[in-house]
Amino acid sequence: MPIGTPSVPYRLPGSQMERWVDIYTRLGVERILFLGQEVSDGVANSLVAQMLYLDSEDSTKPIYLYINSPGGSVTAGLAIYDTMKYVKSDVVTICVGLAASMGAFLLTAGTKGKRLALPHSRIMIHQPLGGTNQRQASDIEIEAREILRIKDMLNHSMAELTGQSFEKIEKDTDRDYFLSAAEAKDYGLIDRVIAHPNEA
């Protein structure tokens, strides 16, 4: 039986009445966002809107983005990435579980010094995926050029974010490349491995 989205009690500031809200709404009040699924256009639109709102409310406070994601759409992920860079608020990224593919890219895109992972997290980087789906050769060629352009852009960004050479990133992302939290720190994907909330 599915668990569904849990509800928790929440008291509005200045009110004596409690009301029940879903856990993600309650976390949002504390500037905590959660990417806990595949990156899609809908997920990206929701995260972008929440980051823009929180930044407009108070750009001096950080936004916390917890990530447990297998990755997903490159274009949707780049919308989140661009917004992370656009907002004035620091974006603290924290891997809980798995940050793979676009999830790993977003983890690494957090504010320098504030890219974190829990001890048993796994991080996986690789090149962007694409498929042909029985289309005309000219369409396949166009898509292949676009995938290569995106791959080059992502590899350059990842090299800049990690301090690794472009050539190393290109080689390591040729196939699925898994790292433990400690290995991800050594690689430059994150800044610290944390075990307690007060370390964030």
UniProtKB/Swiss-Prot annotation:
Task: Supply the InterPro entries for this chain.
Answer: ClpP, ClpP/crotonase-like_dom_sf, ClpP/TepA, ClpP_His_AS, ClpP_Ser_AS
What gene name is given for the protein in this entry? Answer: clpP2
Q: Which Gene3D superfamilies does this UniProt record tie to the protein?
A: 2-enoyl-CoA Hydratase, Chain A, domain 1
State the protein's purpose.
Cleaves peptides in various proteins in a process that requires ATP hydrolysis. Has a chymotrypsin-like activity. Plays a major role in the degradation of misfolded proteins.
Origin species = Prochlorococcus marinus (strain MIT 9313)
Q: Name one GO molecular function term.
A: ATPase binding
Q: Could you tell me the keywords of this UniProt record?
A: Cytoplasm, Hydrolase, Protease, Serine protease
Q: Which family does it belong to?
A: Belongs to the peptidase S14 family.
Q: What is this protein called?
A: ATP-dependent Clp protease proteolytic subunit 2
Q: Does the keyword Protease apply?
A: yes
Q: Where in the cell is it found?
A: Cytoplasm
Give the NCBIfam families listed for this entry.
Answer: PRK00277.1, PRK12553.1
Q: Which reaction does it catalyse?
A: Hydrolysis of proteins to small peptides in the presence of ATP and magnesium. alpha-casein is the usual test substrate. In the absence of ATP, only oligopeptides shorter than five residues are hydrolyzed (such as succinyl-Leu-Tyr-|-NHMec, and Leu-Tyr-Leu-|-Tyr-Trp, in which cleavage of the -Tyr-|-Leu- and -Tyr-|-Trp bonds also occurs)
Q: Fetch the Pfam families from UniProt.
A: CLP_protease
What subunit structure does UniProt give? Fourteen ClpP subunits assemble into 2 heptameric rings which stack back to back to give a disk-like structure with a central cavity, resembling the structure of eukaryotic proteasomes.
SUPFAM superfamilies per record: ClpP/crotonase
Q: What EC number(s) does the entry state?
A: 3.4.21.92
Question: Which BP terms from GO are recorded?
Answer: protein quality control for misfolded or incompletely synthesized proteins
The active site of this protein is located at 101 (nucleophile), 126
What disulfide bonds does the UniProt entry report for this chain? Answer: none
Q: Which CDD domains match?
A: S14_ClpP_2 (cd07017)
A GO cellular component annotated for this chain's UniProt record is: endopeptidase Clp complex
